[in-house]
From Swiss-Prot:
GO molecular function, one term: fluoride channel activity
Binding-site positions, Na(+): 67, 70
Taxonomic source organism: Natronomonas pharaonis (strain ATCC 35678 / DSM 2160 / CIP 103997 / JCM 8858 / NBRC 14720 / NCIMB 2260 / Gabara) (Halobacterium pharaonis)
A GO BP annotation: cellular detoxification of fluoride
Protein name: Fluoride-specific ion channel FluC 2
Transmembrane regions: 3-23, 43-63, 96-116
Modes of activity regulation: Na(+) is not transported, but it plays an essential structural role and its presence is essential for fluoride channel function.
Organism ancestry: Archaea, Methanobacteriati, Methanobacteriota, Stenosarchaea group, Halobacteria
Length: 116
């Protein structure tokens, strides 16, 4: 990885983390602010992919900013790409499987946390 690319990811990640924190402070309702950042992050990731500007700016936005701002954007892009590639069953499986796994992980995490 080139130094410029690594710095771009770091700068994007710092900006994404601060933006996520700011949204949480300003909205103040967890389900609402999470939904907002997930939808906006997906939109931004899609714009970056669609624009295909490549290089350090692309990874600053996608891996850095969106990665820190939300992880949902990557999931959404991957699912859409599967569907666009004609892999509709895989896209549906990815969507349902990821959501089910995430919900199960939260449930198990809560249970494990309560047991400590």
């Amino acid at each position: 990885m080139a130094l410029l690319t690594a710095l771009a990811v770091g700068a994007g990640g710092a900006a994404g983390a601060v933006a996520r924190y700011a949204v949480g402070l300003s909205v103040g309702r967890r389900a609402v602010d999470t939904g907002l950042v997930n939808v906006f992050g997906s939109l931004l990731f899609g714009v970056a992919i669609g624009a295909d500007f490549g290089g350090a700016p692309a990874v600053a936005v996608t891996v850095g900013f969106c990665g820190a701002f939300t992880t949902f954007s990557s999931f959404a892009v991957e699912t859409v790409r599967l569907a666009e590639d004609g892999q509709r069953l895989a896209a549906a499986g990815n969507a349902v499987g990821t959501l089910a796994a995430a919900l199960l992980a939260v449930f198990l995490g809560i249970a494990l946390g309560a047991a400590l």
